Swiss-Prot record:
EC identifiers of the protein: 2.6.1.9
Native species: Methanococcoides burtonii (strain DSM 6242 / NBRC 107633 / OCM 468 / ACE-M)
The gene coding this protein: hisC
Pathway recorded for this protein: Amino-acid biosynthesis; L-histidine biosynthesis; L-histidine from 5-phospho-alpha-D-ribose 1-diphosphate: step 7/9
SUPFAM superfamilies named among the record's database cross-references: PLP-dependent transferases
Protein name, entry field: Histidinol-phosphate aminotransferase
Modification type N6-(pyridoxal phosphate)lysine: residues: 224
Chemical reaction(s) catalysed: L-histidinol phosphate + 2-oxoglutarate = 3-(imidazol-4-yl)-2-oxopropyl phosphate + L-glutamate
Alphabetized InterPro entries for the sequence: Aminotrans_II_pyridoxalP_BS, Aminotransferase_I/II_large, HisP_aminotrans, PyrdxlP-dep_Trfase, PyrdxlP-dep_Trfase_major, PyrdxlP-dep_Trfase_small
Gene3D superfamilies noted in UniProt: Aspartate Aminotransferase, domain 1, Type I PLP-dependent aspartate aminotransferase-like (Major domain)
């Protein structure tokens, strides 16, 4: 028997996740100086982490030889205070929110189940679901990237186990109205997962709905507004009944001692968080006004740019040659061939982006 035959049948047809390009990759491929490259393809915080988080990492460095608490209780308590949600409804996850997605998929999805995904959106939902035997049902968003709730509800069947929603959506930046989420959740027994990775940049959040509906889950991350992408840490807000079941299959010690220390400190640093949000708001306005292509409105820390009649792949390549890393959205299902996602950077970075796009 060939060794690859040991791999589950479900894995063979799954497309590998496409990450944003790294600075090291661009330096190697284009012969650029690392200091000249700006990374605006992965929606990281251009201000970096909270100084308090860095201090906490240093202060706790000697403790990394000891296992952290199995359920990340200290971090969960800090998240509870930050969100005003009871700790009994919160799980910390690693690596990142992806760990939460993997855990939920292992918990509820089996062969023959279906999951509904509104595209274009974050591609890891599909990977986590299909790896556990699910069939993916796509519901394509409207031209303005809003969700047609009636069309989504029509896609549900008795086999639907999970519905994945992203708000603000990646890569489009728009939010799903609370009333639409409620309409979906009350019309099904399936779990409704709402990805709020970018919620700190949005006007509202829907975490409170978890306390009112027993099939809504909210996923969040420390990778964006909190500037801790390298720590790979997220969390889930879910009904108590689901948390009790989730903890049965959660990977033990899945949030490291270092990550917990940094996360707790970052949650306490409202000054750094507010600076990050303020920088994003100002940068968004500048890019929307100055970029010479159509820019969609956003409640995230990135803008979506339609470079038609050019191809996103061609424009992205030209920008890479100039040391500007952005995200070609061609790999997102149903995103088309002309969309580019640009992380909102510092004033200087944004000005460089506008100049580069203007030269296209």
């Amino acid at each position: 028997m060939a060794r690859y035959e040991l791999i589950k049948d479900e894995i063979g047809s799954i497309a590998k996740y496409v990450p944003g390009r790294s600075i090291e990759d661009i330096v190697k491929n284009y012969g650029l100086e690392p200091s000249s490259v700006i990374k605006l393809g992965s929606n990281e915080n251009p201000l970096g982490p909270s100084p308090k988080a860095v201090e906490a990492l240093i202060a706790n460095a000697q403790g990394i030889s000891i296992y952290p608490s199995a359920d990340a209780r200290e971090l969960v308590d800090a998240i509870s205070e930050y969100t005003d949600i009871p700790a009994a409804n919160i799980v910390a996850s690693g690596p990142g929110m992806d760990g939460l997605l993997d855990g939920l998929a292992r918990l509820v999805i089996a062969n023959g189940d279906e999951v509904v995904i509104t595209t274009p959106t974050f591609s890891y939902y599909e990977i986590a679901a299909r790896a556990n035997g699910a069939t993916t049902v796509y519901v394509q968003r409207e031209k303005d990237f809003s969700i047609n709730v009636d069309k989504l509800l029509a896609a549900l069947t008795p086999n639907t186990k999970m519905i994945f929603l992203c708000s603000p959506n990646n890569p489009t930046g728009n939010v799903i109205p609370e009333e639409d989420i409620l309409k979906i959740a009350t019309a099904t027994d399936a779990l409704v997962f709402v990805d709020e990775a970018y919620v700190e940049f949005a006007e509202k959040n829907i975490a409170h709905l978890v306390l009112q509906h027993d099939n809504i889950i909210v996923g969040r991350t420390f990778s964006k507004a909190f500037g801790l992408a390298g720590m790979r840490m997220g969390y889930g807000i879910m009904p108590e009944w689901l948390r009790e079941e989730y903890m049965k299959i959660a990977t033990p010690f899945n949030v490291s001692t270092a990550a917990m220390a940094a996360g707790i400190a970052a949650l306490s640093d409202t000054e750094h968080l507010n600076k990050s949000i303020e920088l994003t708001v100002k940068g968004k306005k500048f890019l929307q006004e100055e970029l010479p292509f159509k820019v969609y409105d956003t409640q995230a820390n990135f803008v979506l740019v339609d470079v038609a009649p050019h191809k996103a792949r061609d424009v992205t390549t030209e920008l890479l040659k100039k040391g500007i890393i952005v995200r070609d959205c061609t790999s997102f299902a149903h995103a088309g061939l002309s969309l580019i996602r640009v992380t909102i950077g510092t004033k200087e970075q944004n000005e460089k982006v506008v100049k580069a796009f203007s030269d296209i």
